[in-house]
């Protein structure tokens, strides 16, 4: 891995160990490193936590956002539309995550941002796995978030981001249910 990245072993090893510590990777042995798969229960717990925390962030962002912030969010959505049209899942994933963390920046909640980063590290692989299957559902409610923030409506922004997490999360939920149903095979 270090060779592929054109760097020395130490920073790669440190990064891998950090991801193991954060629960994103598992390392049964020094030569066996894998992406950790969340259980259905873990996914549902993370989704519930995100709904509360990101709801709080969206509500505060609605109160704090400048017109420039709103335009930046709208531009991110335009770029995400282009990524969807181009079937560029990687770019879409990056823009989706950037959108959610831009809300944190607007809300000026750095401690909460750090907590959400930890949750995203754990759920990121599942989001990546389901993003292409989710298609439009992965960003549809972002438009309502932006409109609510533009209108300075914290309650609507909170509901919009929570609905986004539920709607986009349906694909993830189905993946986890399917895994659970085939575990006995």
Residue ranges and their predicted role:
Residues 1-63, 170-185:
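Short linear motifs at protein or domain termini
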Residues 4, 134-185:
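C-terminal regulatory/effector modules of DNA-binding transcriptional regulators
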Residues 21-26, 118-121, 135-136:
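Mobile beta-alpha loop/short-helix "lid" or hinge segments that flank ligand
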Residues 30, 53, 75, 137-140:
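Alpha-helix N-cap/N′ positions at the starts of helices
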Residues 46, 67-128, 140-148, 156-166:
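Conserved amphipathic alpha-helical segments that form helical-bundle/coiled-coil interaction surfaces
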Residues 62-63, 108, 131-132:
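Short helix-capping/hinge motifs at transmembrane helix termini and TM-loop junctions
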């Amino acid at each position: 891995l270090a060779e592929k990245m054109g760097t020395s072993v130490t920073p790669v090893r440190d990064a891998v160990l950090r991801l193991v510590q954060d629960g994103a990777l598992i390392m049964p042995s020094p030569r066996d490193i894998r992406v950790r798969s969340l259980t259905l229960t873990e996914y549902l717990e993370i989704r519930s936590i995100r709904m509360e925390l990101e709801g709080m962030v969206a509500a505060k962002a609605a109160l704090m956002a400048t017109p420039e912030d709103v335009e930046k969010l709208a531009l991110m959505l335009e770029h995400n539309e282009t990524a969807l049209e181009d079937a560029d899942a990687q770019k879409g994933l990056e823009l989706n995550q950037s959108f959610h963390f831009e809300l944190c920046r607007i809300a000026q909640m750095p401690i909460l941002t750090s907590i959400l980063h930890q949750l995203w590290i754990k759920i990121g692989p599942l989001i990546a796995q389901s993003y292409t299957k989710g298609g439009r559902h992965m960003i549809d409610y972002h438009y309502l978030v932006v409109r609510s923030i533009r209108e300075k409506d914290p309650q609507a922004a909170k509901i919009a981001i929570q609905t986004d997490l539920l709607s986009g999360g349906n694909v993830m939920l189905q993946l986890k249910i399917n895994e659970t149903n085939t575990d006995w095979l």
